[in-house]
């Protein structure tokens, strides 16, 4: 795989002072690298293919559908509160810079469906943990997480627990 780290742009003080934002758009614009990212994240779950891929708003919406297509799974968006039009299951969560609510349509995940949760970045683990809680509220089974990047110093893995986690690059 190409060295992903070389394609990530740091944006200091975004979205607020003191935060260094990891911009993945510089990696996504390279078609060869994008294909490698999708294949590498997908291949970790090929033996036990999930039924659904849940992509976390917003950059999980970029990776999630491509991984779903690669694995032959359905795609489900996990959106910020108030953005989905039908009845939802929801969970409050904290990030490195805010508190928010995440929602998934109640009919998006059926009982015992195997679910892979996808996002671009694992930081504090708050968003990932909230998404797993919603999947479990809907009686789905979380089979793991897939992230392009991890900010390991923020210890997000501790919040997620014992689920399998695939990360392509740690910072």
UniProtKB/Swiss-Prot annotation:
SUPFAM superfamilies assigned to the protein according to its UniProt record, in alphabetical order: PRTase-like
Record's protein name: Adenine phosphoribosyltransferase
Subunit structure: Homodimer.
Enzyme Commission no: 2.4.2.7
Family: Belongs to the purine/pyrimidine phosphoribosyltransferase family.
PANTHER family associated with the record: ADENINE PHOSPHORIBOSYLTRANSFERASE (PTHR32315:SF3)
Subcellular location(s) of the protein: Cytoplasm
Keyword Glycosyltransferase: yes
Catalysed reaction equations from the record: AMP + diphosphate = 5-phospho-alpha-D-ribose 1-diphosphate + adenine
Any one Gene Ontology BP term: adenine salvage
InterPro entries: Ade_phspho_trans, PRibTrfase_dom, PRTase-like, UPRTase/APRTase
GO CC annotation: cytoplasm
CDD domains linked: PRTases_typeI
Pathway: Purine metabolism; AMP biosynthesis via salvage pathway; AMP from adenine: step 1/1
Broad class of where this protein is predominantly found: cytoplasm
Keywords (A to Z) from UniProt: Cytoplasm, Glycosyltransferase, Purine salvage, Transferase
Function: Catalyzes a salvage reaction resulting in the formation of AMP, that is energically less costly than de novo synthesis.
Pfam families in the cross-refs: Pribosyltran
Gene3D superfamilies per record: 3.40.50.2020
One annotated GO molecular function: adenine binding
Keyword Acetylation part of the UniProt annotation: no
